Amino acid sequence: MALLDDVKSELAAIDNELPIAKKAQATAMIRFGNGLHSVDHHILVQAQLDSQDAAIWLQDTIRNLYGHEATLTPVSRQTPTGVVQRFIVRVPKGSAALVLQTGLYSRYTKNMVLGLPGDIINGKIAQIKAAWRGAFLAGGHLSDPGKASYLEIVCPNHEAALALVSTARRLGITAKPRKLRSSERVTLRDPDAIERMLILMGAPHSAREWTGKRSDGEARGKANRLANFDDANMRRSAKAAAEACDKVRQAFEILGDDVPDNLKSAGQLRLDHADASLEQLGRLADPPITKDAIAGRIRRLLQLAEKTEKARRQAA
């Protein structure tokens, strides 16, 4: 646990990021810290973290960046392996405004975003790195030296896991989702990918310490070759995903509020899960639909926007 604590302390000490990156980190910490609750039909933001440094960072950011007061409460509980301490960051007033500010509540669908907001998933690389940093601060685990290598983040739901997988891909890293009992997790097992992710998140000192202590004996060059081999495919996939999201975003701008609910939901799913397949998008729909149905709805959304824009030009 000592090395994991060091990693989280190093990440929480970063203070030179742009506001968009700080917002992405705070949003991820709330989402992956199981921070969204419904109390008497009202939203309450209450995130649980295992790092005091991370909790202090989140409390300060909610106050200084979003303008809401947050409380920080340490709690302890006895387990078979000893006393476990957690830190609760709670927003007693202004939680509803905060989820709107973070993008965890969609203005388009009028529902909570189950993964990460599309503005982060499709955002700048600084936002992607910050989102992974926030997710790791909230739910991250790292293998101890001398044991099988892994970096893992416990996710609140499947959609959040998909968001991490797709954003890791934008960083050129392959992360795998898996289900352990009732828990959704995203895991990196390649030592070089773990070292690279630690550096990208902003923990170069911890990355060097972890790399120096690991004893798995795996050749580092193999991972580098695999990463280079995958780069071209990753770039092509990222370009196609970005183009698809741009078209949907443009359609929303053209149509404004005049969008049928089923088409709006399909478009928002594409924005929220840019790298998901049509089949995955269909499963994420509420209720679930086929990949052909989700593709048809997105196609009709784009056609409706094109028709509307054409009519406006003719009227002018």
Swiss-Prot record:
Residues the UniProt record assigns to the DNA-binding region sit at 277-310
Q: Name one GO biological process term.
A: regulation of sporulation
Q: What keywords is this UniProt entry annotated with?
A: Cell cycle, Cell division, DNA-binding
Q: Give the superkingdom in one word.
A: Bacteria
- GO MF: DNA binding
Q: Write one Pfam family the protein is assigned to.
A: WhiA_N
Q: State whether keyword Thylakoid applies.
A: no
Briefly state the protein's biological role: Involved in cell division and chromosome segregation.
Q: Which PANTHER family is this protein grouped with?
A: CELL DIVISION PROTEIN WHIA-RELATED (PTHR37307:SF1)
Q: Which HAMAP family match?
A: HTH_type_WhiA
Protein family: Belongs to the WhiA family.
Q: Write the protein's name.
A: Probable cell division protein WhiA
Origin organism is Bifidobacterium adolescentis (strain ATCC 15703 / DSM 20083 / NCTC 11814 / E194a)
